[in-house]
Amino acid sequence: MVSQTSTATIGFTLEDFAALLDKYDYHFSPGDIVAGTVFSMESRGALIDIGAKTAAYIPIQEMSINRVDDPEEVLQPNETREFFILTDENEDGQLTLSIRRIEYMRAWERVRQLQAEDATVRSNVFATNRGGALVRIEGLRGFIPGSHISAREAKEDLVGEDLPLKFLEVDEERNRLVLSHRRALVERKMNGLEVAQVVVGSVRGIKPYGAFIDIGGVSGLLHISEISHDHIDTPHSVFNVNDEIKVMIIDLDAERGRISLSTKQLEPEPGAMLKDRDLVNEMADEMAEIFRQKRLAEAQGIPYEPPTSVDDTDDEEDESLAVSAVDE
C-alpha cells in the first residue's frame, strides 16, 4: 500500500517545482546592486550566481572602469562580490551584470569628496589634444584645459608626466571632470609668497591687457593698469618677451590660482617704468617697504606718514645752522 505522503511526493512534477520557484523568486531590476558568486569563467566574460533561476552574465567590458584584457584580472572562480544589474532579463531569462558601473558611481563620489576638501591630486598625462591634456582620476577621464597647464615644456611633451592637479569642475550628470595644473602649482608656490614681496620674473607673454610674468615656474599677471602711473597704450611698448624685470606681488588668489603683480607700485616717481627702468629695479625693495607701511596704516585706520629721507634731514639741519649763524 502506498501512503498519501508517497503519492504526494510522486505527484510533484517539474512544472510544480518551477511554479514554486516563481512564487519565491526574488525580483531583480536594472540598477539594483546584488551579491553574486562567480561559478564559471569564460574567455570574454563570466557566469554569476545571484540567486536567480538563470545564471547572470558579466561581459569583459563591464568588469572594470579600466581596460581589462582577461576576465581573471578581475574575477576568480567562487569569488563573491557586489554586482550592478545592468539590464532586464533577455529572452533566455538571463540578466547582464556590471562591476564597472559600481566603480564609476563610487569614483564620482570620491572625486566630489576630494573637491569638497580642496585636495591636490596627482595623475599622469596619457594624451594631449588641441584643447589641453587628458588624465585619469580614480579611473575617470579628466581634462586639463590648455589655459590651466603651467609648464615650460611643449604641451605634447607632457605625455607621461606626473602632474599635481586641483579640481575645477566635477559634474557627474554631464560627465565633466575638469582640472587645473596651474592652480596646483600656484597654490604650492603661494606658500612661499606674500603680498608686497618683490620677486624677479621673466616676461613669457604679452597681451593687450597686460603681461604674463614667469616667477619660478608659475605665471602672474602684470595688468596694464599696474605697469606705470603714466598712461600706456599697450604693454608691447614697454616689454619684450624674455625681458627680466622686478615685480611686486599685490594679490594672491589661491582659489582661482591667480597671482597679480605690479611695477607701478615700485616707481619712485610717476612714469619711471617708461623712463628709467633701472632706477625702478634699484629702488624696488625700498618702494615695496613703503607699500607695506601704507597697507598697514590702512588696516589700522590711521593716516600714512612717509618716512623722512636722509637728504631732507640734511637740508633741515643746514637751514637750522644758517638761522643760528644769522642770529649770532
UniProtKB/Swiss-Prot annotation:
Residues 311-328 have a biased composition (Acidic residues). Pfam families: S1. GO terms for molecular function: mRNA binding; structural constituent of ribosome. One of its GO terms (cellular component) is ribosome. Belongs to the bacterial ribosomal protein bS1 family. The keyword Protein biosynthesis does not apply. The lineage of its organism: Bacteria, Bacillati, Cyanobacteriota, Cyanophyceae, Synechococcales. It comes from the Bacteria. SMART domains: S1. NCBIfam families: PRK07400.1 (NF005639). This is Small ribosomal subunit protein bS1A. Residues 31-100, 118-182, 196-264 form the S1 motif domain. Keywords: Repeat, Ribonucleoprotein, Ribosomal protein, RNA-binding. The keyword Ribonucleoprotein applies.
